[in-house]
Each structure stands twice: as C-alpha cells, then as structure tokens.
C-alpha cells in the first residue's frame, strides 16, 4: 500500500496530435503605423495611427474547427506633445478605436471540471493618458 500513489480509474484515450498546427500561433501577424509631426512655436505634437492584424489561429493543440480563433483587426491612435524647452511629454492614446471584440484564446477544462470550454475576450476600446520625462 502506498498512500501517495494516486490511481486513475480511466487514464484517457491517447490522441495523436503530430502534424497539427501550434495553438495560438497565427500564420501572419503585423502592424503598420503612420506618424505625422506638427512643429509649433512651443513644441512638437506627433500624431500616430496604427493598424494591427493577426490571422486566424488554432485555439488548442487538437485543431478543432469550433475552437479556432478568428482573425483580429485593430486601429489605434496616439497624440504626443513635447515642449521645446522641457524634458517631458504628455500622450493621449486610444486602442481598438472600432471597439471590435474577438475571442482572444480558448481554455478547455479537464474532465474533472466538467470538460467545459472557456474563452477570453479581447479588450474593448480603451483610452489613456500618460506623462513621461527623460533625464
């Protein structure tokens, strides 16, 4: 008798996943941005518009169609002001301007947890302000 040995009534059925695509690994992912500087008497304002793309990808190692994660497309924008006579900046930013929501990832619970599937959802449109300095 070994009190630390855990027996398992059903060890499961082996599944061959060789040749399957890696989960959470898109075939294509990129971002592109446009910057424009506006030089004024008191400082420089930089505007940036960016586009982020990630192609569809597998949600799990089993490559099941109902667990695929759809492609993601996001537009982001920032406006940064830097004064000519200072070593600081202030930045306004917005991410996911279109407020698009996607499945971000899948999580499959074990049979002990009922075998349910859970998903994370990408962030909604977010706004922010930041301050910075250099020294």
Task: Please annotate each region the language model reported.
Residues 1-76, 121-125:
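C-terminal extracellular loops and terminal segments
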Residues 50-60, 81-135:
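C-terminal beta-signal and adjacent terminal beta-strands/loops
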């Amino acid at each position: 008798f070994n009190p630390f040995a855990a027996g398992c009534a059903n060890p499961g059925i082996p599944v061959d996943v060789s040749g399957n695509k890696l989960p959470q690994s898109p075939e294509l992912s990129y971002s592109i941005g446009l910057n424009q500087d506006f030089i004024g008497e008191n400082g420089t304002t930089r505007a940036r518009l960016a586009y982020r793309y990630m192609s569809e990808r597998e949600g799990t190692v089993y490559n099941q169609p109902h667990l695929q994660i759809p492609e993601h497309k996001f537009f982001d924008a920032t406006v940064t002001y830097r004064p000519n006579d200072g070593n600081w900046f202030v930045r306004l930013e917005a991410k996911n301007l279109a407020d698009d929501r996607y499945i971000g990832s899948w999580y499959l619970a074990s049979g002990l947890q009922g075998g349910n599937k859970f998903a994370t959802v990408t962030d909604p449109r977010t706004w922010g302000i930041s301050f910075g300095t250099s020294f």
